Every structure is written in structure tokens, then in C-alpha cells.
Design a protein with these regions (language model features):
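Short, glycine-/small- and polar/acidic-enriched structural segments
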Residues: 24-162, 166, 173-183, 198-200, ...
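Secondary-structure end/capping motifs
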Residues: 220-301
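Cleavable N-terminal signal peptides
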Residues: 10-11, 21
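Pocket-lining segment of extracytoplasmic ligand-binding domains
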Residues: 84-85, 157-158, 163-255
Length: 318
């Protein structure tokens, strides 16, 4: 081997080592909540799946109503939230792009009512606890009301996050007739039927779908990291299938639940693998985004429609 060949090989090796080191140093801060659907993100971090793909991930628990502010300030670069929330953020000047789907709710989000309320239309003139406008619980409330001939103007909305909203129902708080919440907090209400009942969930109204996205700047500067985030998530979904006990224990611990309790709450949603992602973004995502955007405009959460064609970039799920 000539000296030139040795130098060439050394250069290739050093470049490869540098590339690995650079990938391992790719830092990304992600904003999520304790929602069951987001848990594979936590699993991917805690089980070292993100790290194996060259990511240094920091997860921050941020209420949905504040997550876009954290993105705008640069505190986080990526987040998980519902499909319609990305519409709100972009319409309000917080540029973000969805890159993969996390989950679909199959009864994991719902409306809880006090005894005596027989149907959703009975809520006219009543008080409902829900997160602030621009969040999934508020959107779910608006969606369910619309499907039953009402609007948010027909009820009084008091702003409570999903966990305290569920707790208010369980405690029988006076002045709260209904509440919008989701798993794992919805199961706490299921266990207390005397406090109220679940009158509707996303089994009745299939409209909660969560996706993961980042700022356009982060995606442009870190395309490999974006791909690693998607692949790390798919690794986590695969791990849930191959080592369920360990996976549920890790995910449950993050929300102070046993693995068994967390597994119970997960039965009301479905995490989406790569094949499901590709199918979702082939048509359903755009169709739902249009319907959701129209409702958001109608209820005054947004003042103008963002460019719906720029809400997602599907190259990272291939």
C-alpha cells in the first residue's frame, strides 16, 4: 500500500468518525405533555433509541397552550401535538412542519358529564372545563358541539388543563357540568362512575390525531437528525411490540403509573408505524387539515388560513 493510499484511507476514516461524532452531538429539545399518545417519544429517549441514532434529546413537559411559545423563543426545536394545532400555530406566525404521525385516538379523548346530562345538546347554557382555545381539548369540544347543533358560544368554557379538568369531575366540583380530558386521566373518571360518565369519545367522533414536527429552520439545518427522530420513534413502536412489559414500565414511570395501568390507558389509542404513516400522509392528513382549518376559522381560533400545503414534509418517513 502506497503512502498516498494510506492517507486516502485515513482521510475517509477520519471523515466517517467526524460524521458520527457530529451526529451524536446533534442536540434537539422536544416539547410534549403526559398524554399517552406521546409516550413512545419518552421511550425512545429512555431506552437509548434516539441516542443510538446519533441524537442528544431533551424532553420538556410543556402545556399545549404554551408549546408554540417555547418554539417561538427557541427553547425547543420540535414538539408533539394534534394535527389541527399545527394549523393554529402556523396561522399565528409560529412556523412549524409536521414530519411524522404519532398516534390516533380510539376513545382516548373524551367529554365527561355529570349525572343528569343525557346528551351533548343538553349542555346548552352549562359550564364545561376545557383547555384554552388553540388546544386539542378545546377543539374537541367545538367539534363535538358542532356535530350536535351547538357552538362554543352556547356554553361557558372555564379553562382547566386535562388532568385538573378530570379531577374536578371526580371531586364533584360545583359549577362544572362537563369536562374535556384524555388518557391517562380519562381512565380515572372511568373508575368513578358515580362522579359522572363519559358521554362521548373519539370512538364516536374520530378527530384526534397526533403528529410530531419541528421548525423549518431545524429541518433545513439538520435533515439527518430529523430522519433519526422519525426512525427513533418507529424503533420505539417496534419495541412496544417486541418487549411490551419493559416498554410500558418505562412509559408508565414517566407519568407516575405502573406498567399495567399505563398499558390499560394505551388500549384507547393506536401508535402509528412507518406503513401507517405513509398511508396517513398520502391523503387523510390533507383532508382532515382542511376540515379542521374551516372549523378553527369558524369558531374564531384563527383569523386566516395558513398555507395548508406546507404543513407537512413526508421525506423523513420513507
Amino acid at each position: 500500500m502506497t503512502p498516498i493510499h494510506k492517507l486516502a484511507i485515513a482521510a475517509v476514516l477520519s471523515t466517517g468518525i467526524a460524521s458520527v461524532a457530529q451526529a451524536q452531538d446533534t442536540k434537539v429539545a422536544i416539547g410534549i405533555s403526559g398524554w399517552t399518545g406521546f409516550a413512545p417519544i419518552t421511550l425512545a429517549k429512555e431506552a437509548g433509541l434516539f441516542q443510538k441514532r446519533g441524537l442528544d434529546v431533551t424532553i420538556k413537559k410543556i402545556p399545549q397552550k404554551d408549546r408554540h411559545l417555547a418554539i417561538a423563543s427557541g427553547d425547543i426545536q420540535c414538539a408533539a401535538t394534534t394535527v389541527e394545532t399545527w394549523i393554529v400555530w402556523n396561522a399565528n406566525g409560529v412556523a412549524t412542519t409536521q414530519i411524522f404521525q404519532l398516534d390516533k385516538s380510539y376513545g382516548a379523548d373524551g367529554m365527561v358529564v355529570k349525572p343528569g346530562i343525557a346528551k351533548i345538546s343538553d349542555l346548552k347554557g352549562k359550564t364545561v372545563a376545557a383547555s384554552a382555545p388553540g388546544t386539542a381539548p378545546y377543539f374537541t369540544l367545538a367539534w363535538m358541539l358542532k356535530k350536535n347543533g351547538l357552538t362554543t358560544k352556547d356554553v361557558t368554557v372555564v379553562n382547566l388543563e386535562p388532568q385538573p379538568a378530570a379531577n374536578a369531575m371526580i371531586a364533584g366540583t360545583s359549577g362544572v357540568d362537563a369536562a374535556m380530558t384524555y388518557e391517562p386521566y380519562l381512565s380515572a373518571v372511568r373508575a368513578k362512575p358515580e362522579a359522572g360518565r363519559i358521554i362521548a369519545t373519539t370512538l364516536d367522533y374520530p378527530m384526534i390525531m397526533d403528529t410530531f414536527g419541528c421548525t423549518p429552520q431545524f429541518l433545513a439545518q439538520n435533515p439527518r437528525a430529523a430522519k433519526a427522530l422519525a426512525d427513533g420513534y418507529f424503533d420505539a413502536v417496534a419495541m412496544i411490540g417486541s418487549d411490551a412489559k419493559k416498554s410500558f414500565e418505562i412509559m408508565g414511570a414517566d407519568v407516575k403509573q405502573s406498567g399495567e395501568a399505563f398499558e390499560g390507558s394505551s388500549k384507547y389509542l393506536r401508535w402509528q408505524d412507518r406503513a401507517a404513516n405513509q398511508k396517513f400522509f398520502a391523503g387523510e392528513h390533507a383532508q382532515f387539515s382542511k376540515e379542521a382549518a374551516d372549523l378553527l376559522l369558524e369558531i374564531g381560533v384563527i383569523k386566516q388560513l395558513p398555507d395548508l400545503s406546507k404543513l407537512a414534509d413526508t421525506q423523513f418517513i420513507r
